[in-house]
Each structure stands twice: as structure tokens, then as C-alpha cells.
UniProtKB/Swiss-Prot annotation:
Belongs to the methyltransferase superfamily. PrmA family. The keyword Signal does not apply. It comes from the Bacteria. The lineage of its organism: Bacteria, Bacillati, Cyanobacteriota, Cyanophyceae, Oscillatoriophycideae. Its EC number is 2.1.1.-. This is Ribosomal protein L11 methyltransferase. It catalyses: L-lysyl-[protein] + 3 S-adenosyl-L-methionine = N(6),N(6),N(6)-trimethyl-L-lysyl-[protein] + 3 S-adenosyl-L-homocysteine + 3 H(+). The keyword Zinc does not apply. One of its GO terms (molecular function) is protein-lysine N-methyltransferase activity. Disulfide bonds: none annotated. GO terms for cellular component: cytoplasm. The gene is prmA.
Length: 298
């Protein structure tokens, strides 16, 4: 049964999606995908049978319930079944279709042929096991914010993408006109996915520089400072990094932050204010929000 995989299905409140993705990634799953069923989300993920016992799956189910209770959301329902390897390779992909985002962008799965008769910016993507297919509200909010921001900026900009996942935000930024993006993620699979998607979108590696690590590695990697930051990760991780944003950015820099539930917005805003950042706009979608912030130049 070495070629068999567990297909894990999590039925959950849509506002739990990012937390479930994070938990499945930490558990070791690959090829995550989401579809909407009524008022709920169904998240599918896959893990080799040889590495995972039934007790492990039961523990995963418990952790997912605990994660939901911490944010006062309904308990998710987790189920699993064994499938053959060839079924795994195609099963999750059939649920992911092209996604239009903002006024100018469309996310196209790598295994589909993109249109040639469109003025839209096409971001081709194969996320592998990394987070970021463009279907989650936080990813969409970040891309829409980037579209607005990079349309406003007449001068070439250099950005930092902290927690790059599949590379979707970095690639979107380059295709929207950013001159250079430095992308980091602590997960080596995310680093690999971002590099693969960089190649898929024919982006020069000198324009999108990808490394394993977090903000500390960026501070060592970047010669000088960046014009902007984009960061779509868990709110508590963002909170811990805010004090380091100043050293990373120029005096008139901006940042786009998401992965944040509405109920987490106030502590994030308070921490930003303590470190001389101004909230220019707070965009909301469902129970998620996206901070558009700038340095306080006064």
C-alpha cells in the first residue's frame, strides 16, 4: 500500500480556511484545494498512507476542532479515505478553476491552457503543497490591494513578500509592475513552489529573489530597504514581526497585511500605531480583513 494516499476532507466555516490550510500543512499534507458547498467550505488534502496512522488522523481532527473553538467558530467535520496514487495526482486539481481577481488579474491553473485574446494579467500557478491558489479571501484582498497600490506608484518599487507560500503575491506584484520582489518562507516546499511558479510565469530570477527564512533573513538579504511589504500569514506571526518592519522599509514605505480575522484587527492596529504605522485603509471580506498601512512620516 506504499502507493496509497489518505484523502482528508474538512467541512468547515469559510472563515476557518486559512487556519485549516495552516494545520494541514503542518501535518504534512500535499495538494490542498477548496470548494464551496452551500454555506461551508470543503478543503481536501493528501498525505501518504505509509507516513500516517489512523491515530494521527484522529489527532488531526481534534486539533482542527480546537483551532475552531479558539476563534469561536463552528466545529469542522473531518473525514478521510484511502485512494490510489494516480487518483491523488488529479483529484484535487479538478476542483480548482480559473479565478478572476480585481479589475485586471486572472489566476490560471498550470494544467489549463490560458487564453491568448485577453487584456487581463494572467498569473499561472501550480501551488503544489503551498498555500495560495487565489481562492481564499485573504489572498484576493492582498492582490486587489497590490493592484491599487502599484497602479498609484509611478516610480519602480522593490517589495518584500514575507511568507510567500505558492508565490502568488510576489508573481502578481511583478506582473503588475513591481521592479523587484524579495520573497521568503520558512517552509522549503513553499520556496520550491514559488521558484517553480516564477519559471512558469517566465519571470527573471533577478527580479523575483526567493529564499527560505523569515524577516530576519530579509534584513540580511536585501541591500538597503524596500518600498513596500506584503504579508499574508497568521495574525499572531504578523504581530511579532511588526517591530522589525521599520528596519526593513524606507521612510515613506507602505505595507499590505492579511491573514487577519476581524476580531484580531484591533490588537494589530494598536501594535502598528505603537511602531509609527498608520492604517490607511482596512478592507473586509467575510470575517477576514486586509490592512493597507503606511509609515507615519510626521
Amino acid at each position: 500500500m506504499a502507493n496509497s494516499w489518505w484523502e482528508i476532507q474538512v467541512l468547515c466555516d469559510p472563515n476557518l480556511e486559512e487556519s485549516v490550510f495552516w494545520r494541514l500543512d503542518k501535518f504534512g499534507c500535499s495538494g490542498t484545494a477548496t470548494e464551496i458547498k452551500g454555506q461551508s467550505s470543503v478543503i481536501k488534502a493528501y498525505i501518504p498512507q505509509i507516513t500516517t496512522q489512523l491515530l494521527d488522523l484522529a489527532a488531526l481532527s481534534l486539533w482542527l476542532i480546537q483551532d475552531a473553538l479558539l476563534v469561536n467558530l463552528p466545529r469542522p467535520i473531518t473525514r478521510w479515505r484511502l485512494i490510489d496514487e494516480e487518483d491523488w495526482a488529479s483529484s484535487w486539481k479538478q476542483h480548482w478553476q480559473p479565478t478572476e481577481i480585481g479589475d485586471r488579474m486572472i489566476i490560471y491553473p498550470a494544467w489549463l491552457t490560458p487564453p491568448t485574446d485577453t487584456d487581463q494579467i494572467i498569473i499561472r500557478l501550480d501551488p503544489g503543497s503551498a498555500f495560495g491558489t487565489g481562492t481564499h479571501a485573504t489572498t484576493q484582498l492582498c492582490l486587489e490591494s497590490l493592484e491599487m497600490r502599484l497602479t498609484m506608484d509611478a516610480e519602480p518599487v522593490t517589495l518584500a513578500d514575507i511568507g510567500c507560500g505558492s508565490g502568488i503575491l510576489s508573481i502578481g506584484a511583478i506582473l503588475l509592475g513591481a521592479q523587484k520582489v524579495y520573497a521568503v518562507d520558512t517552509d522549503p516546499l513553499a520556496v520550491s513552489a514559488t521558484r517553480s511558479n516564477r519559471h512558469l510565469n517566465e519571470i527573471d530570477p533577478n527580479h523575483l529573489i526567493v529564499n527560505q527564512g523569515s524577516i530576519e533573513q530579509l534584513l540580511d538579504l536585501i541591500p538597503g530597504q524596500v518600498d513596500g511589504i506584503v504579508c499574508n500569514i497568521l495574525a499572531e506571526v504578523i504581530m511579532d514581526m511588526i517591530p522589525q518592519f521599520t528596519a526593513l522599509t524606507k521612510p515613506k514605505s507602505w505595507a499590505i497585511l492579511s491573514g487577519i480575522l476581524l476580531e484580531q484587527a484591533k490588537p494589530i492596529a494598536d501594535t502598528l500605531e505603537q511602531h509609527d504605522w498608520v492604517v490607511a485603509a482596512l478592507w473586509k471580506r467575510g470575517d477576514w480583513c486586509c490592512f493597507n498601512i503606511r509609515k507615519n512620516s510626521d
